[in-house]
Amino acid sequence: MSKRRIAPLTFLRRLLLRILAALAVFWGGGIALFSVVPVPFSAVMAERQISAWLGGEFGYVAHSDWVSMADISPWMGLAVIAAEDQKFPEHWGFDVPAIEKALAHNERNESRIRGASTLSQQTAKNLFLWDGRSWLRKGLEAGLTLGIETVWSKKRILTVYLNIAEFGDGIFGVEAAAQRYFHKPASRLSVSEAALLAAVLPNPLRYKANAPSGYVRSRQAWIMRQMRQLGGESFMTRNQLN
């Protein structure tokens, strides 16, 4: 009887290990490949597209146009750093002080959860993982973040982030966002336009770049002040990000 009970558990354990090993090979290969090859689509894009189809929205298209950093306005990279991760050039994927502050805040305010994800973590999550807040996903995100921080340069991380970030319903990447909202290529985005796009990033399905609320306008102004305090374009040059 005991052998019959143990056998299924052993099978499940081996199956789980094989799945994890296969995922590790898949993700590791993806990290290596996308260190030099443009990203055709992300996990978030695939998730949005499949959800739309399952919901009967057959006209939905998760649209993205890959562009190199040379074809992106330096203001755009600076804007997302100012908005999302001002220590991006310094850390190895995790902003520990920010994580500690977020944990302390969330203990006091359970109804208003604050995140502390760096651009590296967001890139790993958007590229390879699903939406959610489970400990499993967080653990996988941490491993993938270490992987891309080890293999990719900071410039590459920022380039991929800007090409797969969600800026609105079906709008992925800064080139698609620039064309949709401002009718111009990403290379020609101004300071204020870049700050406006960065202002919707906390929740691009709630906040609209083409119909900005008072909160979005206020956040846009704050981001522009932070961009100046960081040093403007010289920040990007100094940290070899453009």
From Swiss-Prot:
It is a single-pass membrane protein. Pathway: Cell wall biogenesis; peptidoglycan biosynthesis. Coiled coil: none annotated. One of its GO terms (biological process) is regulation of cell shape. It comes from the Bacteria. One of its GO terms (molecular function) is pentosyltransferase activity. Its EC number is 2.4.99.28. The chain crosses the membrane at residues 19-39. This is Biosynthetic peptidoglycan transglycosylase. It is an enzyme of class 2 (transferase). Its main location: membrane. Belongs to the glycosyltransferase 51 family. The keyword Phosphoprotein does not apply. SUPFAM superfamilies: Lysozyme-like. It holds the Pfam family Transgly. It catalyses: [GlcNAc-(1->4)-Mur2Ac(oyl-L-Ala-gamma-D-Glu-L-Lys-D-Ala-D-Ala)](n)-di-trans,octa-cis-undecaprenyl diphosphate + beta-D-GlcNAc-(1->4)-Mur2Ac(oyl-L-Ala-gamma-D-Glu-L-Lys-D-Ala-D-Ala)-di-trans,octa-cis-undecaprenyl diphosphate = [GlcNAc-(1->4)-Mur2Ac(oyl-L-Ala-gamma-D-Glu-L-Lys-D-Ala-D-Ala)](n+1)-di-trans,octa-cis-undecaprenyl diphosphate + di-trans,octa-cis-undecaprenyl diphosphate + H(+). Peptidoglycan polymerase that catalyzes glycan chain elongation from lipid-linked precursors. GO terms for cellular component: peptidoglycan-based cell wall; plasma membrane. Keywords: Cell inner membrane, Cell membrane, Cell shape, Cell wall biogenesis/degradation, Glycosyltransferase, Membrane, Peptidoglycan synthesis, Transferase, Transmembrane, Transmembrane helix. It is found in: Cell inner membrane.
